[in-house]
Structure formats: structure tokens, C-alpha cells
A protein has these predicted regions:
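Nucleotide-activated sugar donor-binding and catalytic core shared by glycosyltransferases
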Residues: 1-396
């Protein structure tokens, strides 16, 4: 049984199931996820879309549906009795399934750690109580769980395998009616509806300011699947100003590989951009209520994962009140015009890529599940995936 939420979790879960089927073609997989997990052959009891939100106030409208889905998954586990339950990130949902799995005697593996090092560290006790093994994708997470006495394995980041462009840059840009000879700024506003509502208006307002600083600039927008067209209405004003804008669905890697610089919402996309060596600016905004509450609990000095992995601020971050159209335009224009700065950032991003492990993360995770041995943190018979450096906070 497997449970994931959000586009990134669905991507990782689907790749994991593909790798499991290479080991055991007859493996039965069911649970909660999205189209990528379904494409891997999982029997989905529910689809995560509509459950994934950011923030406290944003979560209230989905609580009733979440409880119904949790009950359906608990009942499915009681009926079908899986050997292993794999939780993929999505802790606000998945943590509520852990006690039921323990009561049924189902082994629990958590693949892709919740960000305990950033906030809500009390969740570590829940993991220690209910989880048989953690499979982590960032090197500094291994040391955190080892200190807590939780069996853990660093398998590497699945995006090392998955972050691949499908088309040559020039062909991709021409297919989307953009000129390969002109500068391209990619905009990645997030994958959740709540993120787009908070982030995309600011990016749209910044676009004409970037154009005023960088003549000929074009805008390439990465759109996550299954998002409503109305969420992208802020871009209508950009088009009305005569600026070239292409919105591309389900091709984030091609967008990143084609861009000269990127403005991205904080999250998985920052790692994806790093793997493509794309100079970037990280932005984020929450509701005022959620941000005010969250500031009291956040324990890190950076929001962007690339900065946390690097242990220092290698990519600029514009968060909440700092996220203004003027600030975005200044940073983006600098990356598009200052070649020395952009190249220095690419070198820093290469050091981040080197810590994320060798190819084969999904295969290593699948083999960890396939052993059935959850008592020790055994060494995988795979190439080294990188040294687990202890960097829970930026600048530490």
C-alpha cells in the first residue's frame, strides 16, 4: 500500500512502483495518489488532487474530504492486508494512517522525509513510534534520524534520474512559438492551487518590469497538470502588454532546460532547477495568517531547499513581504544580463547536485522495500550515493 500527495510525491511514487515491478513483476500495489502512480499500475482508492493545500486557513475546506479518504484507506488496509505501507512525504495526511498500520501489523516505510528539521520537530517522536524505516533523499536528513535512533537509509534524490528534458532546446521553444535567439525567463508558480493564487499575480506583475530591463525577453510558464485555467488569468495582462508568454503543461524539465534564468516558487522545483543548472530566484507567499503562525515555528534561516543543502545562501530568496514585483524584476534581470553572476550560481548549483546521490534512487528505494528486513540500516549493493553531511539549517 502506498500513499502520496502533490505532483512531486506522485512522481516519486510512480518511479518507485516502476522499480518495484522490475524486481517483482507480480507485486500488487494499491493506495492514494495521482496519474503517475496510476500509470505505474497502482490500484488507486483515491486521487490526491483537491487534497493538497498550503497553509492553515487553506486546509480547512478539505478537512471533511480528507477524513473520508483516510477512513477509506484504513478500511482498504484492513481488507487487503498489505505487507508494507509506503508513505511518501505528505505528512499532514499520511501521519494519520500510521497508527492504523501499526495496529494491523503492517511494516511502515516513510519515503521522502517530512521537513522535521524546518518545523514541527515533535513529529520525530511519531516517526520513532510508528515507522520501521526512513528512506531519505537529502544527505543531511540521514544524520538527523541516526541521532534519534530511527533506522534510516539515504537512497539519493529520485530527480537525479527523472530531471531530463524531452526535446532539444531550440525545437521546444519553437514548438511553443518562442524565439531561441532571445532571452527566456521561466516562471514556476507552484503545483497547488493555493500556491498559484498567492504567487502567480506577483510574477505576472513583475513580467513587464523585467521586459523594461531586458529587451526581447520571453516568458515560459511551467503548468502542473490538472490545474484550472482560471488560476492562470493573471498572465492575461502580460499578454495584453504584448509580451511573449508560453504556458506549457507537464513539461517542467523542458521548461527549465530551455530557460536562461528561472523564478520559482519554493519547493521541489528548486531542486529540479538545480539539476538543470538553471540560475534562479526563489519566491514564496502564504496567507498573512498562515505566515504569522508559521514564523513562530520555522527553525531554518532559508526556505529554498538548494540553500539548505548547500548550507548557505547560494540563490536569492524573496519571501512574503520581500516578494514584490520590483524585487523579482531586479533579481531576474540581473541573472539574465550579468553572465558572471549567472555562471557563479551555476557552479554553486553543481555542488548541490553532487550531494544528491548517483542515479538509481528509485531502484535503491525499491530494493530496500524488497528485502523485507527492516531491523537494520543495511548497506545497499549500489554505487556510493554521496556523503551524508549534517546540514539541517542554512549557514550552520
Amino acid at each position: 500500500m502506498i500513499s502520496c500527495g502533490e505532483a512531486s510525491g506522485d512522481l516519486y511514487a510512480g518511479a518507485l512502483v516502476d522499480a518495484l515491478r522490475e524486481i517483482d513483476p507480480g507485486v500488487e500495489v494499491f493506495g492514494f495518489g495521482g496519474e503517475r502512480l496510476r500509470a505505474a499500475g497502482a490500484d488507486l482508492i483515491g486521487d490526491y488532487r483537491g487534497f493538497s493545500v498550503t497553509g492553515l486557513s487553506e486546509a480547512l475546506p478539505v478537512l471533511s474530504r480528507s477524513w473520508k479518504m483516510l477512513n477509506a484507506l484504513r478500511e482498504a488496509a484492513r481488507t487487503r492486508r498489505p505487507d508494507v505501507f509506503v508513505a511518501v512525504d505528505f505528512p499532514d495526511f499520511n501521519f494519520r494512517l500510521l497508527p492504523a498500520m501499526r495496529a494491523l501489523g503492517v511494516k511502515v516505510v516513510y519515503y521522502v522525509s517530512p521537513q522535521l528539521w524546518a518545523w514541527r520537530p515533535a513529529r520525530l517522536e511519531t516517526i520513532r513510534r510508528y515507522v520501521d524505516r526512513m528512506l531519505v533523499i537529502f544527505p543531511f536528513e540521514k544524520a538527523l534520524y541516526e541521532r534519534a535512533g530511527v533506522p534510516v537509509e539515504f537512497v539519493g534524490h529520485p530527480l537525479v534520474d527523472l530531471a531530463r528534458a524531452g526535446q532539444p532546446r531550440d525545437a521546444f521553444l519553437r514548438a511553443n512559438k518562442l524565439d531561441p535567439a532571445r532571452p527566456v525567463l521561466a516562471l514556476l508558480p507552484g503545483s497547488r492551487p493555493s500556491e498559484l493564487r498567492h504567487v502567480l499575480p506577483g510574477l505576472a506583475a513583475a513580467a513587464p518590469l523585467v521586459a523594461a530591463r531586458v529587451p526581447g525577453v520571453q516568458f515560459l510558464v511551467a503548468r502542473a497538470p490538472a490545474l484550472d485555467d482560471g488560476l492562470f488569468a493573471p498572465l492575461d495582462a502580460v499578454r495584453a502588454a504584448g509580451l511573449p508568454v508560453a504556458i506549457v503543461t507537464g513539461a517542467t524539465d523542458d521548461v527549465l532546460a530551455s530557460a536562461d534564468a528561472v523564478v520559482t516558487a519554493s519547493g521541489t522545483a528548486t531542486v529540479q532547477a538545480a539539476l538543470h543548472g538553471a540560475p534562479m530566484v526563489i519566491v514564496y507567499r502564504l496567507s498573512a495568517f498562515t505566515y504569522a503562525v508559521g514564523r513562530r515555528f520555522v527553525r531554518v534561516s532559508s526556505y529554498g531547499m538548494v540553500n539548505l543543502v548547500a548550507g548557505r545562501l547560494i540563490v536569492p530568496e524573496l519571501i512574503q513581504d520581500q516578494f514584490t514585483p520590483e524585487a523579482v524584476a531586479a533579481e531576474a534581470a540581473s541573472l539574465l544580463t550579468d553572465r558572471a553572476r549567472a555562471e557563479a550560481m551555476r557552479r554553486d548549483l553543481a555542488t548541490v547536485r553532487a550531494t544528491l546521490g548517483s542515479p538509481g534512487a528509485s531502484r535503491r528505494a525499491a530494493r530496500a522495500l524488497g528485502t523485507g528486513d527492516f531491523s537494520t540500516d543495511r548497506a545497499m549493493k549500489e554505487p556510493e550515493v554521496g556523503r551524508a553531511n549534517d546540514r539541517p539549517t542554512s549557514g550552520s
